[in-house]
Amino acid sequence: MSQDYKTTLHLPATDFPMRGDLPKREPAILERWERDDFYAQLRAHAKGRPLFLLHDGPPYANGQIHLGHAVNKILKDIIIKSKHLDGFDAPYIPGWDCHGLPIEIAIEKKYGKVGVTLDAVQFRQKCREYAAEQIQLQRRDFKRLGVIGDWDAPYKTLDFRFEADEIRALAKIVDKGHLIRGTKPVHWCFDCGSALAEAEIEYTDKTSPMVDVAYPALDPSALAAVFNATLPPDVQLAVPIWTTTPWTLPASLAISVGPTLDYVLVEGPTHSGQRRWLILAEALAAKALARYGIAELLIHGSAKGAAMEQHILAHPFYPDRTIPLLLGNHVSAEDGTGAVHTAPGHGQEDHQVFQQYGLLNRYSAAELNPVDARGVYLSTTPPLGELTLAGLHIWKANPLIVDALRLRGVLLAAAEMHHSYPHCWRHKTPIVFRATPQWFISMEQAALRSAALKAITHVTWYPQWGQARILSMIENRPDWTISRQRTWGVPIPLFVHRHSGAPHPRSAALMRQIADRVEQQGVDIWYSLDQTELLGTEADQYEKITDILDVWFDSGITHEAVLLERGLPKPADLYLEGADQHRGWFQSSLLTGVAMDNAAPYKQCLTHGFTVDQHGRKMSKSLGNGIEPQDIIKTLGADILRLWIASTDYSNEMSLSQEILKRTTDAYRRIRNTTRFLLGNLHGFDPTLHLVPLSDMIALDRWIVHRAFELQQTIKAAYTRYDFAEIIQKILNFCSVDLGSLYLDVTKDRLYTMHENAPGRRSAQTAMYHLTAAFVRWIAPILSFTADELWSYLPGDHADNVLFTTWYDGLAPLPPNAPLTAADFDKLLTLRDHVTKVLEPMRANGVIGAALEAEITVAADADTAARWQPLTEELRFLFITGDVTVTPANTDGFFVSAQATTKAKCARCWHYRADIGAHPTHPELCGRCITNVDGPGEQRHWF
């Protein structure tokens, strides 16, 4: 080439870096956000707009944030930012859950239990200090994720004002008649030394003893007569029960049978040389006898369970205790024997049966529940023969009780069972049901259950199955145990009568007075309060309750203590948490909201799945498959983590591995490279001077703006329904297909070779400006750091931050009367695909190198040919080939053929043209390039 024409080309130029270098670049952006008070500015720009309120469920203030925390906070942040772009004012007030056992345990490890080195006041102060330290650590990590919010004024359940508002919320619930006191079996953790809520329980596999125990009939002949059978004088009769909790047998006070179940009187194994008949559910008889070593089913009679009611049995090892046969609808024929040993102090259904029969008052508290808070039998527990139970832990007692039953001849079968069993979520140890005096929010007393079920149907659930799940939970849940026997928490400030145990008749009013004091001095004031100040002459008749509130009550009333307190409306638009919160925060918030206001505190509930590795396994240190968010940020950047979260179907388990992160990084690179190319081609473009009206744009440029408009509508709708994976998929497809494989490739010729101010070049730049201005908004909620950086390179005057704007309004659909309609482009792009397919074998066989070396002939039906012939001169630019000829033919549709060109290659544009060499000034250039270099410039209309 005799002359260097590179200087006559307008190649891309931008300072926007090719490499994201996110771990280094993101902290600088964060510093600027902090310095400029970005969140306050965002709220100021949104002032006066409609409000969208996403209420933050508080994480627990203990330990570093993990991947699940990151997923939750980033999903919320994506929604908050998208709502700002959608024209809403979307405040975000983060919060922390600060009371409860994990913090108590942390302080106990350092200082010992209350009373060892610290009194209760000092202990609570250490808990408060510890929680504040943990909040600082977590707040730093949450901000590093790119999550914006009111981090300088979060809500904390340990704040005096919050604790006071929590007591006021409880007073409302008392006013509405939902609070009750009772001695009921509740989930109990021996390590906590306290009752547990449903949400504090997790199910883990456990191996338990499985025993069948015979309860002899006290009047065997009468019981046999129920089955229309005559009992021979030398035959014994017993009712076997099956249990996996032998330790509860000392508390066994009855046997329950199913009233409508069919029972049979069968021949059982001999006992002490005598025959013994057994009563078994007919559906379970053969299976039970097989456990007892009996192969043959010999039936002596049959009867319904209801016929056995009130017949009396003997306890298997307490001869003085009589055991009535009672009817219980909970008894099934699924497993066991069809007879259930009933210990009302250790089972909720057992307790209900005794309640129905009015039997609870016949027994002392120690008979109902012979186990103390640590899991040890009380000193009053009678021995089992020579086995002393008093002072023995129940888990140690299990095998000893089995041995004692065997010695007494009442053990019919014994084995081990591996099954799912409830454990304490904090200690990971097995829990039990244990009857203790507790405070409850009743599900029935003031019709809370039915009101909550109705409220659920007025909420929109994402995914939809969330509604059925929480409906089932509310339908079947017991009363909510809200009292805890611990130190660090909000007290239940009730005065109860010293003799009757009844709460003071002015309890709600007194609680509000106490709340006013707590707001000024904290919860310690309750414990130091001289009750004569509030009760006057009644003070001697009452005593204070020392229980504290369940931490799920703390977080469950944030709609009252945070939203109302900060002047925000109820219900919130959205609650968003992990799928486990159907039985946690969603449920506690629902119950308190309905109890106080007869309405759910949220309009929508969205749940996300848990994080797992690529094999679907839960991430854990023991498996070595855990990936911490801090490590991802340190090596790849927060935007990569945000992109993975957004691109994953969070309604199910969310898989993450190094390979998945690599694919996510590749996707990020595609987005970054696309935007960098757009910015590079906007070099020298000023939208105030060079923007071309949509109606004057080249047809292809107008079409890509149309495509961007369609995509923006799809993206906006997907943000509205929280489908972020669709957004990422659509954006990546747009980058690869519409832009990378088509538009950016086709427009290079115009952008590089035309005059700087040529209408065709400015048209392409205008389209690219519109694309970039829209694109940066599309990604801003997800790739917040990258969007912030990209925005700073966007030409022209604009707001300081992309989130101070709304969705881009410079896009528009193609009008129906456009010179080339959207339907026309669909056909042309189909034709382009056919051209590509025709050229592939030519390239593979060496007939051509680049597509520019091929000349194309399109034979089409008359109507199609007539539509395409005006475009003939410019179709080569759309196809990026040599000359294109369109001819009418007697065919349906069209047919494409190609041949290698014999023309010379232009040294500047690389097109093969017939007029190269015809111009002595520039013998190496085609006529088009000559007019672009020295002349008025070429004219384009279509491509």
From Swiss-Prot:
Oligomeric and partner information: Monomer.
An annotated GO cellular component: cytosol
Motif 'KMSKS' region, residue numbers: 618-622
Key word Hydrolase present: no
InterPro entries reported for this sequence: aa-tRNA-synth_I_CS, aa-tRNA-synth_Ia, Anticodon_Ile_BEm, Ile-tRNA-ligase, Ile-tRNA-ligase_type1, Ile-tRNA_ligase, M/V/L/I-tRNA-synth_anticd-bd, Rossmann-like_a/b/a_fold
Organism of origin: Xylella fastidiosa (strain M12)
Binding site for ATP: 621
Keywords: Aminoacyl-tRNA synthetase, ATP-binding, Cytoplasm, Ligase, Metal-binding, Nucleotide-binding, Protein biosynthesis, Zinc
Catalytic reaction annotation: tRNA(Ile) + L-isoleucine + ATP = L-isoleucyl-tRNA(Ile) + AMP + diphosphate
Motif ('HIGH' region): 59-69
SS bond partners: none
Function: Catalyzes the attachment of isoleucine to tRNA(Ile). As IleRS can inadvertently accommodate and process structurally similar amino acids such as valine, to avoid such errors it has two additional distinct tRNA(Ile)-dependent editing activities. One activity is designated as 'pretransfer' editing and involves the hydrolysis of activated Val-AMP. The other activity is designated 'posttransfer' editing and involves deacylation of mischarged Val-tRNA(Ile).
Residues the record lists as binding Zn(2+): 906, 909, 926, 929
Protein's name according to its UniProt entry: Isoleucine--tRNA ligase
Cofactor(s) it depends on: Zn(2+)
Residues holding L-isoleucyl-5'-AMP: 577
Pfam families: Anticodon_1, tRNA-synt_1, zf-FPG_IleRS
Primary subcellular site in the record, as a coarse category: cytoplasm
Source taxonomy: Bacteria, Pseudomonadati, Pseudomonadota, Gammaproteobacteria, Lysobacterales
Family: Belongs to the class-I aminoacyl-tRNA synthetase family. IleS type 1 subfamily.
Record-level Gene Ontology MF annotations: aminoacyl-tRNA deacylase activity; ATP binding; isoleucine-tRNA ligase activity; tRNA binding; zinc ion binding
Swiss-Prot/TrEMBL GO biological process terms: isoleucyl-tRNA aminoacylation
Entry's cofactor comment: Binds 1 zinc ion per subunit.
Notes on the domains: IleRS has two distinct active sites: one for aminoacylation and one for editing. The misactivated valine is translocated from the active site to the editing site, which sterically excludes the correctly activated isoleucine. The single editing site contains two valyl binding pockets, one specific for each substrate (Val-AMP or Val-tRNA(Ile)).
EC numbers: 6.1.1.5
Record localization: Cytoplasm
